């Protein structure tokens, strides 16, 4: 269902069962796949492709111009997979031609309220970014990584699979897989045992199948 107050650009491509809430704006060159739900007052700008069964809540801004002085109106992209949740006030920017020209988000990720994902970032699957965490340009979050509330990640950092960055961490270096970090500057505090156990259990289950 598309609410009568929503504004949809003529070039946008929406599958028939996509839901658009009141006063939301869907811009040019936006594609939204089946089962996705866009709440009220959301803004989605293109070129942006959004997969199936995503939920985008009120006042999220998805696919906005990169916050980079070098950006001069070039055509850059945002790609989003399936089954992601973008809570209230989340911002996700497109890429820049100086880097990948594309911001990429995988599937089954949770972006809590007021999270920021900058230009050219790559977010794999099953990532959690807790409220008010933010990542600068060209950051990569590997599968299952968790950023605690108010965590900040410096540009070009790689955050390893199933790692955990505690609340308020200021991350300026790469974080290895399965490692737990905290502090300003963030330092390694040991293994993320919860993530390690979950991953080991999952791998054992997959092997048994």
Specify the residue positions occupied by each region the protein language model found.
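Acidic/polar active-site rim loop that often engages polyanionic ligands
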Residues: 188-194
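Conserved small/polar residues in nucleotide/adenosyl-binding loops
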Residues: 200-207
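Short, glycine/charged-rich beta-strand-loop motifs at protein surfaces that mediate ligand recognition
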Residues: 195-199
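Structural signal for interior beta-strand "rungs" in well-ordered beta-sheet cores
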Residues: 2-182, 186-187
């Amino acid at each position: 269902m598309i609410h009568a107050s929503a504004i949809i650009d003529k070039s946008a491509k929406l599958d028939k069962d996509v839901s658009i809430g009141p006063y939301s704006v869907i811009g040019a060159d936006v594609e939204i796949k089946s089962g996705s739900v866009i709440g009220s007052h959301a803004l989605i700008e293109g070129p942006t492709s959004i997969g199936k069964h995503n939920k985008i809540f009120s006042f999220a801004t998805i696919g906005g111009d990169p916050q980079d002085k070098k950006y001069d109106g070039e055509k850059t992209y945002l790609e989003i997979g399936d089954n992601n949740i973008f809570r209230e006030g989340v911002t996700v920017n497109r890429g820049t031609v100086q880097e990948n020209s594309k911001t990429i988000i995988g599937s089954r990720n949770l972006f809590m309220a007021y999270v920021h994902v900058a230009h050219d970032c790559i977010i794999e699957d099953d990532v959690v970014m807790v409220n008010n965490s933010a990542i600068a340009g060209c950051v990569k979050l590997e599968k299952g990584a968790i950023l605690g509330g108010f965590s900040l990640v410096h540009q070009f950092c790689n955050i390893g699979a199933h790692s955990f960055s505690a609340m308020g961490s200021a991350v300026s270096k790469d974080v290895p897989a399965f490692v737990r970090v905290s502090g300003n500057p963030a330092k390694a505090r040991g293994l993320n045992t919860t993530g390690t156990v979950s991953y080991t259990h999952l791998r054992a289950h997959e092997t048994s199948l």
